[in-house]
Amino acid sequence: MIYADIHTHTAFSPDSRADMADMLERAVALGLKIYGVSEHFNYDYDRLHLQIDGKEVPPIDEAAYFSRALQLQAAYAEKLLFLVGAEFGFDHSPRALERYMRTAEEYRPDFIVNSIHTCLGMDCYFPHYCAGRSKEYAYNAYLYRVLESLDAPYPYDVVAHIGYCSRNATYPDPKLRYEEFADVLDAILRRIIAKDKILEVNTSSKTAGSPFLPDTDILARYFALGGRKVSFASDAHDPSRIGEKREVVSEALKSIGFTHLTIPCRGEHLRAEL
């Protein structure tokens, strides 16, 4: 069974309204031993002036977030290991990279999730990313962005939700399949292993044609290449989704050959048995 969920969001992220204490209470009620928040640091959005619901996304209040999270980390220390993290939306612009490096240095999050949200000038989460583009073109563009992000100059621990572009894709078969993108996926997986990063299994798959991202075919290839470090992420933005599909993910990982999760914690990799 999985007792660690380290990629979630609260009201400090623009797409959540959840109170952090409520999220922690839910994690405790579920019997989690390790719980983490990794709020959005959307400096990739800034350059593109992207909007959500017709409004530009405001920058996170870094000081307020870390202050509140560290207060709760101390308050819940006897109930679970609460990790205070950050999700960096990769962008190659010097301004974004400098801001991420500054955040990592100033606040020293317990862990950092590296992710791709923006591609071809937009957030590839939304259906319009597919408009006028073939699946091959749209997914390749996204995957090569993932590959580029692995060489980010800032420190990071986890490679997030590979297949993010498929979450709301409008193709008849939206699933990101290893066999269709083998070359670039192999390059990604090999680099994750070479850099000793952690591959995230994210259960916020929406309508991607998969119960989690990446799906078992990609996870099996990662294992075959020697990858052993995986983490679990519900990507919950409200308490009801914390730990979602953890039984399904646990069984899938064990069927491939994985025996444990890897938890990033202040520069160390902790082991949590499946």
Feature annotation, model-predicted:
Residues M1-R95, N168-E179, D238-E244, V249-S255:
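An N-terminally biased module of ancient metal coordination in phosphate/nucleic-acid-related enzymes
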